[in-house]
Regions:
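Short, electropositive alpha-helical surface patch
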Residues: 6-17, 102-117, 182-188
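Extended interaction regions within the primary functional domain
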Residues: 11-26, 37-47, 52, 117-119, ...
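A generic secondary-structure signal for well-formed alpha-helical elements
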Residues: 16, 86, 117-120, 124, ...
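Short alpha-helical segments and helix-capping/turn motifs at coil-helix boundaries
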Residues: 35-37, 106-108, 171
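Radical SAM enzyme core and accessory elements
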Residues: 168-325
Length: 325
């Protein structure tokens, strides 16, 4: 990012004020010059959300991928400065599957970003042809298993033939098991829906007042989902079935064979399959909202009991909050 970029930002915002275009600007922000980021963001006003992507907070991970991050002190200061001129939304990005990352370190990174009130976007590592992670040396050194999944909306019929585009994703590393990846997959869904997309943001902020961290809530939900034999347990099983069947093909050829079957391809055409996080957000919000709210109230009751709170009062407060989520 250069000093001149703030002048570009000012001109873009000037156009927005005059014509209402552009309404929003997507920006890939510099990772090492928070001073210039701040100056440019000020000129954009509120039409460009600021990001401070980390990928990981683990030093050996950052060393392996040859990356240098802003420090958490720098990020916290950046947030304070942005809030001074009304820029309240700030996001960060993390990647699961990087060399030396663990389930615990990845979740801890999410915890720290949530504590700074960031919106967090989590991604699975996929191996892009021509990148260092895709070399034979890196594959042997870091990755034990990979699989293939469909790129979101990357399909079509051309000259009567179904054409698909896939991506190779990491499913197991030296420090992350297959089961870790499965756990994290559903965890990412919960965090994106409840925290980042704000469907249960106020509920989570309320629990945080009682030192019940959103991370604890997500983990508790997963624990309960695995045991639940009702509506929410079935939704969890449906999610994991889609993950196991459609996001972990052994080869691109297997992916093509699966999605070219008429029954499977019709799911794509009808919009019944897509990015799992958003697909299941819609399913839960539209079809299972009451059941999920009841599920959360049972969890809230457990928290109140363990903390020695007035259970009925605490649950009533949660119930009122959930009416507006």
């Amino acid at each position: 990012i250069l000093d001149r970029d703030r002048r570009f930002a000012a001109k873009i915002y000037e156009g927005h004020k005059k014509t209402s275009f552009p309404n929003f600007v997507a920006v890939q922000w510099n990772k090492t010059r928070p001073d210039r980021v701040l100056k440019t963001a000020k000129e954009f006003k509120n039409i460009a959300q600021v990001g401070a992507s980390l990928q990981s907070i683990k030093n050996d991970v950052l060393h392996a991928i040859k990356r240098k991050n802003l420090t958490f002190d720098q990020i916290a200061q950046l947030r304070k400065e942005l809030e001074k001129f009304g820029q309240k939304k700030i996001f960060s990005e993390l990647i699961i599957g990087l060399p030396y990352e663990t389930k615990e370190s990845h979740i801890e990174a999410n915890r720290q970003l949530i504590d700074l009130n960031f919106e967090v976007q989590n991604y699975n590592l996929h191996l892009l042809p021509g990148t260092e992670m895709d070399t034979e040396e890196s594959r042997k050194k870091y990755f034990k298993k990979t699989g293939w999944r469909l790129f979101d909306n990357a399909y079509g019929i051309y000259d009567g033939k179904i054409i698909l585009e896939g991506q190779e994703v990491v499913l197991q590393t030296n420090t992350l098991s297959v089961e870790d990846f499965k756990y994290i997959r559903f965890y990412h869904f919960l965090q994106q829906m409840m925290w980042t997309k704000k469907w249960y943001y106020d509920y989570l902020k309320f629990l945080k007042i009682y030192n019940i961290h959103p991370i604890s809530v997500f983990n508790k939900i997963i624990e309960k989902c695995k045991k639940d034999i009702g509506e929410i347990g079935n939704l969890y099983l449906e999610f994991m079935k889609d993950y196991n069947e459609a996001e972990s093909f052994d080869s691109f050829e297997e992916l093509e064979k699966y999605w070219r079957e008429e029954s499977n391809f019709s799911r794509l055409k009808k919009g019944n399959y897509g990015k799992l996080n958003m697909l299941y957000t819609f399913k839960l919000v539209l079809n299972h909202r009451k059941a999920f709210n009841k599920f959360l109230l049972n969890i809230s009751k457990e928290y109140a009991t363990s903390l020695g709170l007035d259970v009925d009062n605490f649950v009533d407060l949660c119930k009122e909050l959930l009416k507006f989520q």
